[in-house]
Amino acid sequence: KVHDQLTGDFDGDGKTDLVFWAQGDQTLYFTRIPADPVLTENWKLIPVYKYYNDSQMEQHGTYPAWKRTNEHEGLAVADIDGDGLQDIVGGGLWFKYLGADKFSYNVVDGAYTFSRSTAGQLVIGGRPEIVLVVGDGLAPMYMYEYQKNTWARKEIVPKVSNGHSLAIVDFDGDGNMDIWYAEMTLGGYAEAVNRILLGDGAGNFPRDIVISKGIDLHDSEIVDLDGDGDLDILGKPYDG
């Protein structure tokens, strides 16, 4: 199982790198994209982080029976510490490149390893905030704000069902970042919500827009598809 892949310049050499979770290996891998990517032998896999399945913290919410003990997923890119280099966010952690093919790992929430991840400036000033939500299961959506060397957790949505689509964007163009998320359930979920939470720049979300209801979206994207300057949603149905 390889769930979640992400590209970015994580080592600061000006070239695009690839990171991915390999749940079968219980490892997050980093690799530089070779000049000839067709040949398998040109790829050098560098372990960033390895987890183990002999125990886990009590996790937020409830999960399907097929979830493995201490399974990690979710990936996002952001400059978390403001040093100008892109960092990796995922599995309730964030990872910083140290040089010489080494990374540090930094815990955000050890009780939310099996989650979708995103990061952005939801509170003006300071480090970007991190948002985690359950991708498979029922659990809250949390925002984490860096305060006094601690990731302070704030509940944003009390209960999300399989929120496998998640992003931070400025949807309404007011300069404050917003959260977009969409739910899904195998077999279909009549209450599945595709929703924008409109931010106020202070970590609050006083207004929301429900874009659709009853349409299950799996790992979908929000992006300007037609070049008209506003954001569109590319949805992948998940109701089979």
Regions found by a protein language model. Name each.
Residues 1-240:
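Beta-propeller-forming repeat regions
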